[in-house]
Amino acid sequence: MSGKTLYDKLWDAHVVRENPDGSALLYVDRQLLHEVTSPQAFEGLRLAGRRPWRVEANLAVTDHNVPTTNRAQGIADPVSRVQVQTLDRNCEEFGITEYGMLDRRQGIVHVVGPEQGATQPGMTVVCGDSHTSTHGALGALAFGIGTSEVEHALATQTVVQKKAKRMLVRVDGQLGRGVTAKDVVLAIIGRIGTAGGTGYAIEFGGEAIRSLSVEGRMTVCNMSIEAGARCGMVAVDDMTIDYVRGRPFAPKGEHWDQAVAYWKTLHSDPDAEFDQVVVLDAAEIEPQVTWGTSPEMVVPVGGCVPNPFEEQDEVKRSSMGRALDYMGLQPGTPIKEIRLDRVFIGSCTNSRIEDLRAAAEVVRGHKVADSLTQALVVPGSGVVKEQAEKEGLDRVFIEAGFEWREPGCSMCLAMNADRLQSGERCASTSNRNFEGRQGQGGRTHLVNPAMAAAAAIAGHFVDVRHWPE
């Protein structure tokens, strides 16, 4: 009998019952909640006269709808205000810990969970949010669920799931200078496509992945969803354990020692078999820039906007044509000649302290291009913001002409005051470049934080490996 993959180990450890239809009832170790997908779930509990099964297993934050300026004045948009106030009331009524809008620990749920130690290796982690896959970077089985499942998890501490197939994405060798975790995952998506991971749980491995920091691994796992996967994960190593050590929710004393002993088993066995293996050479990965309306529409910064007529597949050719029309681009245009209106550094993909340090290093001593309407930096949490300010990063950004904001999802999605106007073009460190994602008619290009910072200074894309040119 062959060994087990990391996914197998995590799955098997949480199966409560296997169902006749092939699904299984999985125990949930941690549920994370936010204001958008939880109101109906709490109302369902209320109508049924139920209470959460394990109150302490839940943690709530406000992130999607919160303003990133003038918080003392409250939320201007009535719908957003109601959603945030509803989460506040629900958490108070049901006794759930919440980091509300004015709490220093507030931030994007997928930044807050790991930094507070609420996400730990070996856990099942669920949230009513597709990018819950982020938490797999810590060797957890983490995936997004729907609102009805949020209610089910609150009431029973379980969810029903079908087991996914197993994919290993191995990135061999070392990354070159200026190439980041964001470039790795965009290159992976460019290789396998946004449907390449459909039906799979992806384990990311190889020398390049192991050399990434835990925050870098979070960036990779965050976008496993954009590759179509159910979840993404990285095996536990000493770096993982050191990351969790001492955080507020982390085990203490002898419980820590017991946890570490278990966590060290959370890796795929040498003889484990995967349903599919994809291999990339790290040395071939360059800084990436998306040009279209899907994360798979991506090329190296030194490349050009592709020509749909060179695509043999009719469906792909048609979608490329539509994307070019929406993005207002011509085939053959060098990526470096694409001029920008706005730059956004933030989101659950790239708003952690390492991301802000990388961006600040590029920005230091420069000024935002006069041609830009706005350059925005939004820390992923209050904790990240405090650390950045302690290091003086806020001054670097502000002196260069960036806006330094309060934490939240911000311009990643058009659910708050930070959004693009129709026709505006944005270099963004977020994870989705769909039509209208950042605002109706807005045009999004996905890049890493240093690339976004350099683009803000130049007013167009540049190769950060040769910065300043």
UniProtKB/Swiss-Prot annotation:
Keyword Cytoplasm assigned: no
GO BP annotations listed: L-leucine biosynthetic process
Protein name: 3-isopropylmalate dehydratase large subunit
InterPro entries named in the record: 3-IsopropMal_deHydase_lsu, Acnase/IPM_dHydase_lsu_aba_1/3, Acoase/IPM_deHydtase_lsu_aba, Aconitase_4Fe-4S_BS, Aconitase_4Fe-4S_dom, IPM_dehydratase_rel_enz, IPMI_cat
Gene behind this protein: leuC
Binding site for [4Fe-4S] cluster: C348, C409, C412
Entry similarity comment: Belongs to the aconitase/IPM isomerase family. LeuC type 1 subfamily.
MF terms (GO), sorted A to Z: 3-isopropylmalate dehydratase activity; 4 iron, 4 sulfur cluster binding; metal ion binding
Subunit (UniProt): Heterodimer of LeuC and LeuD.
Function noted in UniProt: Catalyzes the isomerization between 2-isopropylmalate and 3-isopropylmalate, via the formation of 2-isopropylmaleate.
Cofactor-binding details, from the entry: Binds 1 [4Fe-4S] cluster per subunit.
Domain of life: Bacteria
EC assignment: 4.2.1.33
Species the sequence originates in: Alkalilimnicola ehrlichii (strain ATCC BAA-1101 / DSM 17681 / MLHE-1)
Cofactor(s) essential for the protein: [4Fe-4S] cluster
Pathway(s): Amino-acid biosynthesis; L-leucine biosynthesis; L-leucine from 3-methyl-2-oxobutanoate: step 2/4
Catalysed reactions listed for this entry: (2R,3S)-3-isopropylmalate = (2S)-2-isopropylmalate
UniProt keyword terms in alphabetical order: 4Fe-4S, Amino-acid biosynthesis, Branched-chain amino acid biosynthesis, Iron, Iron-sulfur, Leucine biosynthesis, Lyase, Metal-binding
